[in-house]
Amino acid sequence: MWRVRKRGYFGIWSFPLIIAAVCAQSVNDPSNMSLVKETVDRLLKGYDIRLRPDFGGPPVAVGMNIDIASIDMVSEVNMDYTLTMYFQQAWRDKRLSYNVIPLNLTLDNRVADQLWVPDTYFLNDKKSFVHGVTVKNRMIRLHPDGTVLYGLRITTTAACMMDLRRYPLDEQNCTLEIESYGYTTDDIEFYWRGDDNAVTGVTKIELPQFSIVDYKLITKKVVFSTGSYPRLSLSFKLKRNIGYFILQTYMPSILITILSWVSFWINYDASAARVALGITTVLTMTTINTHLRETLPKIPYVKAIDMYLMGCFVFVFMALLEYALVNYIFFGRGPQRQKKAAEKAANANNEKMRLDVNKMDPHENILLSTLEIKNEMATSEAVMGLGDPRSTMLAYDASSIQYRKAGLPRHSFGRNALERHVAQKKSRLRRRASQLKITIPDLTDVNAIDRWSRIFFPVVFSFFNIVYWLYYVN
């Protein structure tokens, strides 16, 4: 019983296959090629290419499939991308239906010039072409029910308006807009053939700077002054790969910024080394900025990478200005202020010593004369102007006090009074020398700027990086 039913089912299902095989053999048989030729001639005879299928009736439904071969280039400068694809359209034309041969007919690509085809075009196309090696890459396939499958291998460069505010941490949406040029929705309708499976090959695409995160298929109608037109949109969501920019832009900028801090560990009086290092790092950052601007369009807003390079440039430039500040404090403003203070102290000391000598030396036992003191002060000023500012303190050492012995005998009372007077003068000179020493800038005060810079610059730069990456990555 079951065997009989099984054999019956096998006979029912195998009958169409047997018929198809017989027909295929009959078609491929050279003796029956005349039948195929007569069928094609009959279909093309009287066919009017100027009229769409079902002219005057319902609109022609055109289904579309896209098999993406590659995305060759995404250009930020030109705001476009280049796509190579197999573009297929299918519609039904009752004028091309046949029942003599129950098989599909794949015809020569030149037959497409004798049939009606949709006036499809790419709305955001800049430049497109159909491949022609070794012959024009077109396909025409007819089905017995009149369905026509029309395929093309196309390379198109389509416009893609990009928002580069977050470049190179950005995501872009690039679309391919497909539309009918002349036929309105009263004559033609577009739809994605196979719904979500209408576009294939996306997952196989590999781009050097981007990753395809997602894609969407959109069907809509657009209204112009000439009527309503069908439109299909294929939208790619592209995420830029940051690896290239880490190696080519971010890491060099970070290393150059850190290199500019080396000057904080170089001695303050090594002007040639510190200035050369600062200028070199500034020029290197300028070169990186210039190279980056050449690879991007001239846009009116600031990009994320501009913010980072600008921040690095500021840190490098501030490191150069830091040495200018140290140099000015030690070799500029400091010595001028020290010289003025030394002159005031010397003048006051000379005047007071002259008055005291005139009043308290009846026995002609005096300190160094005013002329000798002035000469010694002039010598100290010359030393201060030519050498290290610390050397000015040497002019006021107590050992420079000299006495001139009188030729006349002295009483013990006068000797004691003179000794007390000399002791007072020595003490006063020591105090003057101590005050002058205090006004001289210590090297530790100048080096403190470098010590603070060694901490301040890395901390602020680290904070800048944390804020930058948290903001643009999230």
UniProtKB/Swiss-Prot annotation:
Q: In which tissues is it expressed?
A: Expressed in brain (at protein level), in cerebellar granule cells. Expressed in lungs, in alveolar epithelium.
How is the subunit organization of this protein annotated in UniProt? Heteropentamer, formed by a combination of alpha (GABRA1-6), beta (GABRB1-3), gamma (GABRG1-3), delta (GABRD), epsilon (GABRE), rho (GABRR1-3), pi (GABRP) and theta (GABRQ) chains, each subunit exhibiting distinct physiological and pharmacological properties. Interacts with UBQLN1. May interact with KIF21B. Identified in a complex of 720 kDa composed of LHFPL4, NLGN2, GABRA1, GABRB2, GABRG2 and GABRB3.
Source organism of the structure: Rattus norvegicus (Rat)
Q: What function does the entry list?
A: Beta subunit of the heteropentameric ligand-gated chloride channel gated by gamma-aminobutyric acid (GABA), a major inhibitory neurotransmitter in the brain. GABA-gated chloride channels, also named GABA(A) receptors (GABAAR), consist of five subunits arranged around a central pore and contain GABA active binding site(s) located at the alpha and beta subunit interface(s). When activated by GABA, GABAARs selectively allow the flow of chloride anions across the cell membrane down their electrochemical gradient.
Q: GO cellular component terms?
A: chloride channel complex; cytoplasmic vesicle membrane; dendritic spine; GABA receptor complex; GABA-A receptor complex; GABA-ergic synapse; glutamatergic synapse; plasma membrane
Give the organism's phylogenetic lineage: Eukaryota, Metazoa, Chordata, Craniata, Vertebrata
List the catalysed reactions: chloride(in) = chloride(out)
Record's signal peptide: 1-25
Please give the coiled-coil regions recorded for this protein. none
Membrane-topology annotation of the record: Multi-pass membrane protein
Where Phosphotyrosine occurs, the residues are Y403
Enumerate the SUPFAM superfamilies for this protein.
Neurotransmitter-gated ion-channel transmembrane pore, Nicotinic receptor ligand binding domain-like
Description of activity control: Allosterically activated by benzodiazepines and the anesthetic etomidate. Inhibited by the antagonist bicuculline. Potentiated by histamine.
Tagged with keyword Kinase: no
Annotated 4-aminobutanoate binding sites: Y181, T226
The cysteines joined by S-S bonds are C160-C174
Q: Which Pfam families match?
A: Neur_chan_LBD (PF02931), Neur_chan_memb (PF02932)
Q: Which residues lie on this side of the membrane: Extracellular?
A: 26-244
Q: Which residues lie on this side of the membrane: Cytoplasmic?
A: 327-451
Positions of transmembrane segments: 245-266, 270-292, 304-326, 452-473
Q: Which residues are tagged as glycosylated in the record?
A: N32, N104, N173
**Domain comment in the entry:** The extracellular domain contributes to synaptic contact formation.
Indicate what this protein is called per its UniProt record. Answer: Gamma-aminobutyric acid receptor subunit beta-2
A biological-process GO annotation = synaptic transmission, GABAergic
Tell me where on the tree of life, at the top rank, the source sits: Eukaryota
